[in-house]
Amino acid sequence: MAVQGFQRRLLGSLNSTPTAIPQLGLAANQTGARCLEVSIPDGLFLSLGLVSLVENVLVVATIAKNRNLHSPTYCFICCLALSDLLVSGGNVLETVVILLLEASALAARAAVVQPLDNVIDVITCSSMVSSLCFLGAIAVDRYVSIFYALRYHSIVTLPRARQAIAAIWVASVLFSTLFIAYYDHAAVLLCLVVFFLAMLVXMAVLYVHMLARACQHAQGIARLHKRQRPLHQGFGLKGAVTLTILLGIFFLCWGPFFLHLTLIVLCPQHPTCSCIFKNFNLFLTLIICNAIIDPLIYAFRRQELRRTLKEGLTCSW
């Protein structure tokens, strides 16, 4: 395979020299043609990773501290934050080790680096898969709370939520282990791509259905109070914008990475695909950006969580 889904960069760093200053420019691909390559500075990548780590640690600590936040909804949000934390942590750890190896500040043998690389890859991959799963779980939780409001607490119970969380983590680790072990098999990569597309479609269908129900509810309230039609139109427009932002961020941050995996299967030697492969680190950076955005969308917008976080920060000072 021309390009691996998860590059084995640690082993390659044992005998490498420090890279030049990253830049945006044209690079030659395998056929000698010119293509656009976006290189991400290590400092920027590490900074984004640290921001994500801090944000998601705050979310996990806040939910763990307040017993009022130990509901199924917040459990899913907490696990999403934990997954994003591991995504960022795995990439930051790998980057730091690579930089130390390149600077000859860390002496290591291939026999030691290989298992470390495998462990980091499994952690990163499993946290990516679990992050997608918990995004879907949050969407399902919201859907049930809207369409089955009266039976929500009997349907989405804490024991069931814990069982779902355990199943997601176990499945993510098992699948990621297989993915890392058989990364050069097209079927494994296609399974991961199909999983992403299924999650995207499921989230889009659920949120569009929720938006339609919300618009119907707003229209009913407007008729009850004999309000004007523009109010309903404004609500629908606001909901559509929110939905577009939510799904747009999800697709923008995750789509390029899974496009990368798809092209590995479809055209591993094609010049155009080779140009796209050169931007793998950019695709990882977009996933880190998603780990930064997730707490802003799913956690910090909730008043109870913000209040608990504010109290915790105030007491710490």
Curated annotation (Swiss-Prot):
This is Melanocyte-stimulating hormone receptor. Residues 64-72, 141-163, 212-240, 301-317 are cytoplasmic. Receptor for MSH (alpha, beta and gamma) and ACTH. The activity of this receptor is mediated by G proteins which activate adenylate cyclase. Mediates melanogenesis, the production of eumelanin (black/brown) and phaeomelanin (red/yellow), via regulation of cAMP signaling in melanocytes. The keyword Cell membrane applies. Interacts with MGRN1, but does not undergo MGRN1-mediated ubiquitination; this interaction competes with GNAS-binding and thus inhibits agonist-induced cAMP production. Interacts with OPN3; the interaction results in a decrease in MC1R-mediated cAMP signaling and ultimately a decrease in melanin production in melanocytes. PROSITE patterns: G_PROTEIN_RECEP_F1_1, G_PROTEIN_RECEP_F1_2. One of its GO terms (cellular component) is plasma membrane. The chain crosses the membrane at residues 38-63, 73-93, 119-140, 164-183, 192-211, 241-266, 280-300. The keyword Lipoprotein applies. A lipid is attached at C315 (S-palmitoyl cysteine). InterPro entries: GPCR_Rhodpsn, GPCR_Rhodpsn_7TM, Melcrt_ACTH_rcpt, MSH_rcpt. It is found in: Cell membrane. Keywords: Cell membrane, G-protein coupled receptor, Glycoprotein, Lipoprotein, Membrane, Palmitate, Receptor, Transducer, Transmembrane, Transmembrane helix. CDD domains: 7tmA_MC1R. Belongs to the G-protein coupled receptor 1 family. It comes from the Eukaryota. Residues 1-37, 94-118, 184-191, 267-279 are extracellular. Glycans are attached at N29. GO terms for molecular function: melanocyte-stimulating hormone receptor activity.
